[in-house]
């Protein structure tokens, strides 16, 4: 299957129920810049889609740069959010 057909097979997801379902789950949050991703447990989200993570770890270009603990990510910096396996 080609990449374009993979993309066309994706179904749109309503973001509010999607994020609500990820609370208390491990997630990866990719930022729009610097190839930065934060991985941690989603504690909460608000109506603007700002995110609070606990036990967060920072990755730049796939390399861990340490554990940060509890962090807040402003919504306009987020490229995508994905659920991580436990």
From Swiss-Prot:
- Keyword Protein biosynthesis found: no
Q: Which SUPFAM superfamilies match?
A: Sm-like ribonucleoproteins (SSF50182)
Sm domain spans which residues? 14-86
This protein's UniProt keywords: Cytoplasm, mRNA processing, mRNA splicing, Nucleus, Ribonucleoprotein, RNA-binding, Spliceosome
Q: Which InterPro entries match?
A: Lsm6/sSmF (IPR016487), LSM_dom_sf (IPR010920), Sm (IPR047575), Sm_dom_euk/arc (IPR001163), Sm_F (IPR034100)
> What Gene Ontology cellular component terms go with this record?
catalytic step 2 spliceosome; commitment complex; cytoplasm; nucleus; pICln-Sm protein complex; Prp19 complex; spliceosomal complex; U1 snRNP
What CDD domains does the record tag this protein with?
Answer: Sm_F (cd01722)
Cellular location of this protein? Nucleus; Cytoplasm
| MF (Gene Ontology) | poly(U) RNA binding; RNA binding; splicing factor binding
Q: State any GO BP term from the record.
A: U2-type prespliceosome assembly
- Specify where it is mainly localized: nucleus
More details: Present with 2570 molecules/cell in log phase SD medium.
Q: How does it assemble?
A: Component of the Sm core complex, present in spliceosomal snRNP U1, U2, U4/U6 and U5. The core complex contains SMB1, SMD1, SMD2, SMD3, SME1, SMX3 and SMX2 (Sm proteins B, D1, D2, D3, E, F and G, respectively), and is probably a heptameric ring structure. SMX3 specifically interacts with SME1.
Instruction: Give the record's family classification.
Output: Belongs to the snRNP Sm proteins family. SmF/LSm6 subfamily.
Q: What is the role of this chain?
A: Plays a role in pre-mRNA splicing as a core component of the spliceosomal U1, U2, U4 and U5 small nuclear ribonucleoproteins (snRNPs), the building blocks of the spliceosome.
Q: What is this protein called?
A: Small nuclear ribonucleoprotein F
């Amino acid at each position: 299957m080609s990449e374009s057909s993979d993309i066309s097979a994706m179904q749109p997801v309503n973001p509010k129920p999607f994020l609500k379902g990820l609370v208390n789950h491990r997630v990866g949050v990719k930022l729009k810049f610097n190839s930065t991703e934060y991985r941690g447990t989603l504690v909460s989200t608000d109506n603007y889609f700002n995110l609070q993570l606990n036990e967060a770890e920072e990755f730049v270009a796939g390399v861990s740069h340490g554990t940060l603990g509890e962090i807040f990510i402003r919504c306009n910096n987020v490229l995508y959010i994905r659920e991580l396996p436990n």
